[in-house]
Amino acid sequence: MDRIVSLYWDNVDRRIVEAQRRVFAHFGLAIDQRERTGLRHCDFLDSYMAEVAEDDVALLVDIDCFPLNRAIVDRAFAAARAGRIFGCAQSRNNIDPERLYVAPMFMAISRRTWDRLGRPSFCPDAGNDVAQALHDRAVAAGVEVEMLYPEACVAPKWRLGDFAVFGIGTFYVGGVFHLFQSRRKAYEFILLEVAEATIAGRPIDVLGLIDRALPLRLRDHWVSQFRDWRKAMGLSRVLRRLRRGTPPAPAGARQRAKTEAQ
């Protein structure tokens, strides 16, 4: 059986959940959207893969990710049934951008392949992001991996090796869209508009989305700069006190002094 599943918490905007469901339904596909608030994504994926039947193929999808056509889903399932791992390429953001892997934002894998690899956990560790160790084990075992690479992005944030950049509102070759960082409410309009265009069968106005996102990106930049400045100023005050031989007062003492002054 071909299965499609996504996980979400109760803090995800229900419009995002509904948009994903509607896109899959538009292509004649049912997606099992499971609310498991508080459960780590990797733990959910581990338990889900153990749950599916031996002959099943799973398409693991982030709640803010969906296909832009039916063909890419059929291609993903066909690859997984043939024993391959298929999905969107990602890197560990700014930590290790040269080390690419198929991420479970859009990953097709069969239960047989997962069993063959020894049922590796999807959970991250000090050296790996979610599913990164699974990807490396597959490569070492000779399992063929097919990766889709970004072709456009509304708000670039990270480098993907020497191939491309990705970030908020990324479009992948073949027809996959992933919002990324869906917790950032200001950018939800990107996903909602891409979903509506996909369902309506009209071209996606990527340039228009970029224009609308630009002021948000500039604001994010200056907010980040201000936070860095505040942190630097706080450190400077501590260093000045240490140079004068006056240790910084504990937070509680500062609060008491402030109260007494009032």
Protein language model annotation of sequence segments:
Residues M1-D55:
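N-terminal anchoring/stem segment of glycosyltransferases
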Residues D10-V12, G38-L39, D64-P67, S91-N93, ...:
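Short, solvent-exposed loop/turn segments at secondary-structure junctions
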Residues R22-A25, A50-E51, D74-R81, A140:
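Short, surface-exposed basic-aromatic patches at helix termini and helix-loop junctions that form
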Residues Q33-E35, A89, Y149:
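Residue-level recognition of beta-strand->loop/alpha-helix junctions
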Residues D55, A82-I85, V143:
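Short, high-confidence coil segments that cap the C-terminus of an alpha-helix
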Residues D55-F66:
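Short beta-strand-to-loop acidic/aromatic patch adjacent to the donor-nucleotide binding site
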Residues F66-R137:
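Conserved catalytic core of nucleotide-sugar-dependent glycosyltransferases
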Residues H135-Q262:
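C-terminal catalytic/acceptor-binding lobe
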